[in-house]
Amino acid sequence: MFKEIRKKKNIITLEEIKEVLKKARRGVLSINDEEYPYSIPINFYYDDNKEAIYFHSSRIGTKVDLLNKDNKVCFVAIGKEIIKDLSWAPYVESVVAFGRCNLIKNMDETLQALKKFAMKYYPSEEMVDEEIKVGSIGVAMYKIEIEHKSGKIVQEK
């Protein structure tokens, strides 16, 4: 069902894939639509123990409507750029993950996921707690349960 990376020399290890997912600040979520895929850049949090990607959303909008119709998604994260051998063209890591994305309906689980998500982006736990106290009512949290992932590093030239 999922195709392997064609150029084997570009494949990164499972540990490197996890590092990209842990450290990348943004990713692109692609959702099935009728004629074209719908892709949107998002902030996210990766939990390697649960093999899941979490992101927040409003409770209404195109993304929500499409996920309610079809929960199969593709997610792409771009890792760091590495300059090697005095080359002008960087090497770039990327990860592609496929899975099913669902709204987290349990409020305790939503708040736990929201806190872990926010800790990735905010400088202190105090700020996170304050923001959650003020803004968590209108926030929805989604979980992508990863079914397949792959990663590679390529030189962009």
Locate the predicted segments by residue.
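A generic structural signal for nonpolar/aromatic side chains embedded in well-ordered alpha-helices
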Residues: 21, 66-67, 117
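Active-site-adjacent structural patch at catalytic or cofactor/ligand-binding sites
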Residues: 57-59, 69-82, 91-102
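Short beta-strand segments
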Residues: 24-59, 75-76
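Beta-strand secondary-structure signal
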Residues: 28, 54, 74, 98, ...
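Anion-coordinating catalytic cores for phosphoryl-, nucleotidyl-, and glycosidic chemistry
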Residues: 9, 18, 62-64, 75
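Charged, gly/pro-rich active-site loop segments
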Residues: 2-8, 83-157
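Short Pro/Gly-enriched beta-strand edge/turn motifs at strand-loop
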Residues: 11-12, 23-28, 124-127
